[in-house]
Amino acid sequence: MEARVILIATTNKHKIEEINEVLQSCGYRVEPAAASKLEVQSNRLEDVAAYAAIQAYLALQRPVIVEDAGLFVEALGGFPGPYSSYVFKTIGIRGLLKLLEDVENRRAYFKSVIALAHSGGVEVFTGTVHGVIAEKPRGDRGFGYDPVFIPEGSSKTFAEMETQEKNKFSHRGKAARELCRWLRQYGPPR
């Protein structure tokens, strides 16, 4: 049986690969949509993803998902949180590590939100993984903060893991599994 396609409003090949690796288990796959991702500024990832998904649905007139994620560092009061992408583009991993110089508490968590917009409304799925920020970058896989995030239960950073291994731990993998459960229960969105 051929996998059913759901559009995703991203061109990030790493996100697409990670989400597809999970969705294949429920007979779906995502393909990038030719829609610009409009973001609203909010302290809540759920609001950002839901707004962007609704805008993409209105533009495409087809079911579409948007994934947004953030890294929340305990010692920095949850920073960069929903602004993780902007912070990564401006100060990068080096800047984050500089902020954590001489900081003992390196606990952090990644949160992923997948919003599915369809004719019946918007569904929001979340996944969270707790871990710590490494002292220095390790690994060459993945993207973003993957080289410095070590999930609980592992000694490797996300950037040292293959996609399949990363999805066992990852916030995005957990959110995608929630989406899969919804798709199994309710069938293909319209």
UniProtKB/Swiss-Prot annotation:
Enzyme's top EC category: hydrolase
Cofactor remark: Binds 1 Mg(2+) ion per subunit.
GO molecular function, one term: metal ion binding
Enzyme Commission number(s) of this protein: 3.6.1.66
InterPro entries for this protein: dITP/XTP_pyrophosphatase (IPR020922), ITPase-like_fam (IPR029001), RdgB/HAM1 (IPR002637)
Highest taxon listed in the record's lineage: Archaea
An individual GO BP term: nucleotide metabolic process
Alphabetized Gene3D superfamilies for the sequence: 3.90.950.10
Residues annotated as the enzyme's active site: D68 (proton acceptor)
Binding-site residues, Mg(2+): E39, D68
Positions contributing to substrate binding: T10, T11, N12, K13, H14, K15, A69, F143, G144, Y145, D146, K166, H171, R172
UniProt KW keywords: Hydrolase, Magnesium, Metal-binding, Nucleotide metabolism, Nucleotide-binding
Cofactor(s) in the UniProt record: Mg(2+)
GO cellular component: cytoplasm
Catalytic reaction equation(s): XTP + H2O = XMP + diphosphate + H(+); dITP + H2O = dIMP + diphosphate + H(+); ITP + H2O = IMP + diphosphate + H(+)
Described purpose of this protein according to its UniProt entry: Pyrophosphatase that catalyzes the hydrolysis of nucleoside triphosphates to their monophosphate derivatives, with a high preference for the non-canonical purine nucleotides XTP (xanthosine triphosphate), dITP (deoxyinosine triphosphate) and ITP. Seems to function as a house-cleaning enzyme that removes non-canonical purine nucleotides from the nucleotide pool, thus preventing their incorporation into DNA/RNA and avoiding chromosomal lesions.
Family: Belongs to the HAM1 NTPase family.
NCBIfam families (alphabetical): PRK14821.1, RdgB/HAM1 family non-canonical purine NTP pyrophosphatase
Oligomeric and partner information: Homodimer.
Protein name: dITP/XTP pyrophosphatase
